[in-house]
Amino acid sequence: MMAHMGDGYRIESATPADAAAVAAIYAHHVRHGTASFEIEPPSEAEMAERMAKVLGAGKLWLVARDPSGRVLGYAYASQFRDRPAYRYACENSIYIHHDRRGEGIGRALLALLIVAAERHGFRQMIGVIAGAEPASERLHKACGFVEAGRMRSVGRKAGGWLDTLYMQRALGQGDDTAPDEESA
């Protein structure tokens, strides 16, 4: 994917060398928030494995970097579920460095991820928003997602019960047409 320049940052494809920075950003969210239902953050090695799985499957992982190359946030899309019938649906994940939230980095990452997912042939993108994350819900709404469902009290973290909100957005032609391989 080509680089995209933002105000004080650029967005480009992630590489395995980004695993340490990605792990650090994610660890903060695991320890101090409810955006992830993980209780203990993964190690740098585990994050490198997760990234390799997504990148190795030819899927999408983007990072936003400041001019010095520091990772400010990341977003990725992978197949929504493993079963073959889900092959046209992807799930996005977005995490921004806690010091850089509210600057539009998440919106820029998600907008580019949507374009890349459309080019990849996905027809639906799902945002799975865990816990109490109104900023993530606003971000997804701003990028054209609508609420598709809510599972109540399915997680427990930080002494409370947490919901999971599913938000969905059609990509490209969505479900208006069959994929090319089926229409031949």
Language model: regions and residue ranges:
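A short beta-loop-alpha structural element at the N-terminal edge
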Residues: 10-22
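Conserved GNAT-fold acetyl-CoA-binding loop/helix
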Residues: 23-51
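Acetyl-CoA-dependent GNAT
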Residues: 41-99, 110-111, 170-172
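Conserved catalytic-core motifs of GNAT/GCN5-like acyltransferases
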Residues: 76-79, 126-129, 141, 146-163, ...
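Conserved beta-strand-loop-alpha-helix junction that forms the acyl-donor binding cleft
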Residues: 101, 127-137
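Conserved acetyl-CoA-binding loop-helix of GNAT-fold acetyltransferases
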Residues: 102-115, 138-142
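Conserved GNAT acetyl-CoA-binding A-motif
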Residues: 117-129
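Acidic/histidine-enriched, glycine/proline-rich intrinsically disordered or flexible terminal extensions
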Residues: 173-184
